[in-house]
Amino acid sequence: MDPIADLILSFTKFPGVGNKSARRMVFYLLKRDSAELQDLGRRIATLKDELCVCSRCGNVSSGDPCPICSDALRDRETLCVVEDIDDLVSFEQAGIYNGLYHVLDNRVSPFDDEDLSPESVDSLLSHIRELDAKEVIIATNPRMEGDLTYYTLLDALREAPGMREGMKISRLAFGLPVGGSIEFADRMTLHTALESRTAVSAGNGGGEEK
């Protein structure tokens, strides 16, 4: 295959990158000097070697635990549960939340034949117990997969032993558009969704608090 066409095809495998965007990227690279391309290639080749997954929250950083989990100034009694690292980054860049996180790195999606693994749920429950969290914010995306993931987690939290008595469980408010994604939400939208979050009963059979 032609080297240009081959590289374009490789770039189209990136999320959100179509053929036109991939083509622009390739022709941009062709204009750079060899040293710059070699440096970029080295950074890509060593990316996974220089990073690790935080054993506490699932974030990716150069150290374990990650800087967020290591920060003694953060609110260690509030835990925000997100679907993936992109969502964590969105909250951090918005600067609206000062608690800790837990990255699920999977979700419930019937269309993709995905489900929350028992290991993923157990890891979350262990993290909550370790922190003795006062509040768990379930920050799944406002679409069908996020709803299914939310209810799966809610059931697991309600049935789990060893949680703090009176622990609050809440969910982001729908300042986020239905079908949207935390990853692409602006700061004001995320702030509204977080500040107006809905509390739900932690007890078995409980519904949303009024």
Residue positions per predicted region:
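Short glycine-/acidic-enriched loop or helix-start segments at secondary-structure transitions
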Residues: 66, 91, 147-149
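Residue-level signal for pocket-adjacent positions within structured domains
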Residues: 39, 64, 86, 96, ...
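Solvent-exposed alpha-helical segments within well-ordered globular domains of core cellular machineries
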Residues: 5-9, 23-27, 38, 42, ...
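Extended interfacial segments that mediate partner engagement and assembly in macromolecular machines
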Residues: 22, 71-140
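Long C-terminal interaction/binding lobes of large macromolecular proteins
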Residues: 125-210
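Cys/His-rich Zn2+-binding cysteine-cluster or related metal-binding knuckle/ribbon modules and their
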Residues: 2-4, 9, 13, 23-88, ...
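Alpha-helix N-cap/helix-start motif
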Residues: 37, 113-114, 146-150
